[in-house]
Amino acid sequence: MISIRNVTFSYSGTGQGKIENINLDIEKGSCVLLCGRSGCGKTTITRLINGLIPYFYEGELSGSVEVAGMEISKTPMYQIAEKVGSVFQNPRSQFFNTDTDSEIAFGMENLAWPLEKMLPRVKETLKAINI
């Protein structure tokens, strides 16, 4: 479902580090933990997967990132948002909700899903992740 191929990225004009020649495949249904020291590229990799790079963080990018068959650099942000979300390390920095159900529904609400479609999807997701 997620494929990162020969990706190298360096941020423009920030002096921030870069990642070099990253290759990673993540199968549908997998749970992956990115860990490492500060500045090693964890956040950069998540920004590549969720489309923030190249749309909101400029820099030099080579290689390819595909999510659900979509090449991230060639896909409109709204289509990426239908497939990708982020969960932050600190729960207090999560979006705007205080409960799990609302967090799960957040993306669907922003895409204007009807309630009768959202509720079963929230229940299905909670069951899939054993909550």
Predicted regions and their residues:
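Conserved ABC ATPase "signature" region
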Residues: G69, E116-I131
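A short, flexible loop at the N-terminus of ABC-type nucleotide-binding domains that lies
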Residues: M1-I4, F9-I22, I53-E58, K74-P76, ...
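ABC ATPase NBD coupling module
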Residues: M70-G85, N110
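Conserved ABC transporter NBD signature motif
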Residues: E58-M70
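The feature captures the beta-strand-to-loop junction immediately N-terminal to the Walker
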Residues: C35-S38
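Short helical segment in ABC ATPase nucleotide-binding domains corresponding to the A-loop/adjacent helical element
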Residues: N50, G85, R92, T98-E109, ...
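Short, conserved post-Walker A segment of ABC-type ATPase nucleotide-binding domains
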Residues: V32, T43-F56
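Conserved hydrophobic segment flanking the Walker A/P-loop of ABC-type ATPase nucleotide-binding domains
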Residues: I26-K28, Q79
